[in-house]
């Protein structure tokens, strides 16, 4: 049964998922309880706030908002404070000038009257909220809903809040509508600050002019932007967020980011934000921690509110105002900046009370129910997906979860959490394990195939061979595992094509292609990895003398025609463009007809294409018999051994392969093909070329 059929016929109690996965039958009551708990929150929000649509527009009520007459209304939730004042350069930081009043829900408010019809707080001027807490201490904080903060490292690493309200003529005006949602999602994961070969922090403007055309040329149709939400510590890779409504100022202004998103849309690229709602920076002076003098405003109090490994604060998803803050944060990034969706970071930490720390997941269904599940975290993620998909039907949401929770990518109506895709996190781990622990002739083709195809029925998966995680210092990219130090000496076409480089380039292409073809309903690549970027990522920090040497992407390597990186880059482009033509990512899962452990040959069919992989390190096979369902004449549409991709050209592009009407490996026909060592061929019926 398909997902849409299940939705149509499912009972209205959250147990519809059982029709798709009967193994969930023993957990019927738990599914009902989960569904009922979430519905209870939906009902409460409908009754008290007028529904998720109104509730998620908190940024129009909280923070600083300019009225049509020029007045500025500032509201802040800080129930523990006994006094509160808005201070800034506009009133010489005078704590008596703009006192705030508190309502019964702990929300403080002040109106700053306009001066001659214009806002009294100048654009880009510094502001803070000053509060007195019950002990009598006066504290200063950055407004929780602030839209811009800036950092002057020559003065202090602490961020300062500024009032962002540029004059009309300096406000970026969006010119392009959102592209339609891609049927096949091909994601280019990128970090603005490292997107330059120079040893510096690159800017939004530079990304717009340099990276967008590159991503479009490579054939990707989606960009996933990391480290956009403001984070004081650059080396955190954006995962220790201080200010949730502020776009990082180290790359430029909010208007620059709007231009980036708009220009991406003009190229038909959708833009996803890497959103971090799994935890927050523990910073006090420029974060949410201890905001009103308590440790339990936005977060759980005590140890429950601290993540042991990340050294950060954990949100209390079961609090009405925290839900308002987080749901409004998602809505804000969609509305203000025009993002097309989100990749949710650290979902495993949100789903479980143990946060995945010291816990392995066996796949036993009992692990997904019971006391170890954070039902409030599940509820928040479900409400987030409900809100986003109801308001923005083309919105894309991706979950980073290692646990394999059932129904994560099914709609709430079936008892699911509502994500569109989950990341196939076991796949890159498999490749690292193979390269670290196995000789090439020990590769288990059956396990390779199983890992790539082991995904939940009806739930979409984004496959990837490696992401930013594998590029970070302390780990190695696939190309570094494959070629190691020879990357520095033998990637020139003027040098010997050594066995190590030949093997490395061949397997780099094979790994990417088999992942793309077999691994999911979407594909992701981290910038630079498409061409085998040398070295790792290491941001400036005390441990490396604040060096930018490894905090950059040497994208210029592909432009040097004397280097072999161009071959890998061109192969990656051909792979994306071939997918665009044949659409295997949105086709049904592949039929695998052969997993030959002796020959190290893998054969499967998907989207009308025949995929043939020879992973054997030394053996090539002549007239190798391969089963195929559809009869006819086949031609090569992609060949990893093509000289255009640095290959040895052992199969001619013009070769025709004719089927024979005899069954083979469970298929109605077979054809015979020459498959050289460490190569892959993708064949298509001649009439589809």
From Swiss-Prot:
One of its GO terms (molecular function) is hydrolase activity, hydrolyzing O-glycosyl compounds. The active site is at residues 345, 400. The keyword Iron-sulfur does not apply. It is found in: Cytoplasm. It catalyses: Transfers a segment of a (1->4)-alpha-D-glucan chain to a primary hydroxy group in a similar glucan chain. Its EC number is 2.4.1.18. Pathway: Glycan biosynthesis; glycogen biosynthesis. (1,4-alpha-D-glucosyl)n binds at residues 93, 128. It comes from the Eukaryota. InterPro entries: A-amylase/branching_C, Branching_enzy, Glyco_hydro_13_cat_dom, Glyco_hydro_13_N, Glyco_hydro_b, Glycoside_hydrolase_SF, Ig-like_fold, Ig_E-set. One of its GO terms (cellular component) is cytoplasm. Keywords: Cytoplasm, Glycogen biosynthesis, Glycosyltransferase, Transferase. The record marks 469 as: Transition state stabilizer. One of its GO terms (biological process) is glycogen biosynthetic process. PANTHER family: 1,4-ALPHA-GLUCAN-BRANCHING ENZYME. Glycogen-branching enzyme participates in the glycogen biosynthetic process along with glycogenin and glycogen synthase. Generates alpha-1,6-glucosidic branches from alpha-1,4-linked glucose chains, to increase solubility of the glycogen polymer. Belongs to the glycosyl hydrolase 13 family. GlgB subfamily. This is 1,4-alpha-glucan-branching enzyme. It comes from Aspergillus oryzae (strain ATCC 42149 / RIB 40). The gene is gbeA.
